[in-house]
UniProtKB/Swiss-Prot annotation:
One of its GO terms (molecular function) is NADH dehydrogenase activity. The gene is nuoH1. It comes from the Bacteria. The lineage of its organism: Bacteria, Pseudomonadati, Pseudomonadota, Alphaproteobacteria, Hyphomicrobiales. The chain crosses the membrane at residues 5-25, 78-98, 109-129, 147-167, 179-199, 214-234, 238-258, 262-282, 294-314. This is NADH-quinone oxidoreductase subunit H 1. PROSITE patterns: COMPLEX1_ND1_2.
Length: 319
């Protein structure tokens, strides 16, 4: 009984911390984008505009949340929750430090990959539930994008799994005590970055919402907190992908002098900032270009990386 209560308290604390982290990251993103574009960015609410995310949250909560005529009411309401819930569940197996994970499971990598994939279903569900044609096109793009990136995203981390000899998040981190896997798996890290951006539906792979040609894509008809939940899921997905990348390629909590959780947080912040830099620097490709790159470039590279890594691992383990 006490163990269940303690687990509930820790889980609630983690969820609240993640919600605050997602809000703070929106401020960080806007400030970094402003710096890249040589403008000020948010600077009115709080010091350096730090409390802007609080004001935006209050504004979204206060807005009316309507269901447009012709929408599937059940699916329309369910989609925003599906966007955020799997990402929060994914953080449950992330190892923030030595013996510091909400749930230590032997197949943590597979669980995280599955949770990341579920976010695409929220996009498709919201698009199909909406009466807008723009939403439908955005949902179709999301489905095709999911099929394209999931294939090489899973293969990109397979080399790390073979070297570490485990699917456990903690064991993968411990296997990097001598050298980070970014050194041994640079191709896998690059492919994981591409797939992670696509999984989070971030620029330049935000084609399901693509404001230039689809108005707002799958979220065209959403307002109020339903709209906010989609964006909460997106920003949480960025943080989850960053934490996943740190675990797989950058040594997780390992580092000198500072405590492990601090190292993990710093590394995750740097990777998340890199995603913002990519958004500021790269244009959005055409939809057909993105799909072509995934199937004809990224997937063959991922397969080649797996084959080469497998040969090396077998050769090193041979007597």
């Amino acid at each position: 009984m006490i163990g269940m209560i303690l687990t509930a308290i820790i889980s609630t604390t983690l969820i609240m911390a993640l919600l605050v982290a997602a809000g703070v990251f929106t401020w960080v993103e806007r400030r970094l984008l402003a710096f890249v574009q040589e403008r000020l960015g948010p600077n009115r609410v709080g010091p350096f505009g730090f409390l802007q995310w609080v004001a935006d949250t209050v504004k979204i909560i206060a807005k009316e949340d309507e269901i447009p005529p012709g929408a599937d009411r059940v699916a329309y309401r369910l989609a925003p929750a599906v966007a955020a819930t799997p990402v929060l569940a994914g953080f449950g197996v992330v190892a923030f430090g030595e013996n510091l994970a909400l749930a230590e499971i032997d197949v943590g990598v597979m669980f995280l990959l599955g949770m990341m994939g579920l976010t695409a279903y929220a996009v498709v569900l919201g698009a199909l539930a909406s009466p807008s044609r723009f939403s439908l096109i955005g949902g179709l793009r999301a489905a095709a994008q999911m099929l394209a990136y999931e294939a090489f995203l899973g293969l990109s981390m397979l080399g790390v799994v073979m070297i570490a000899g485990s699917l456990s998040m903690s064991e993968i981190v411990r296997a990097q005590e001598n050298v980070w896997f970014i050194v041994l798996q640079p191709i896998g890290a690059a492919l994981f970055t591409l797939g992670g951006i696509a999984a989070a539906h971030r620029t330049p792979f935000d084609l399901p919402e693509s404001e230039n040609d689809l108005v707002g894509g799958y979220i065209t008809e959403y307002t109020g907190m339903s709209f906010g939940l989609f964006f909460l899921g997106e920003y949480l997905a960025i943080l989850l992908v960053s934490a996943f990348a740190v675990t797989l390629f950058f040594g997780g909590w390992l580092g000198p002098w500072l405590p492990g959780p601090i190292w993990f947080g710093l590394k995750t912040g740097v990777i998340a900032a890199m995603f913002v830099w990519i958004r500021a620097a790269l244009p959005r490709p055409r939809y057909d270009q993105m799909v072509t790159m995934a199937w004809k470039v990224a997937l063959p590279l991922a397969l080649a990386n797996v084959l080469i890594t497998g040969f090396i691992v077998v050769a090193r383990s041979a007597p």
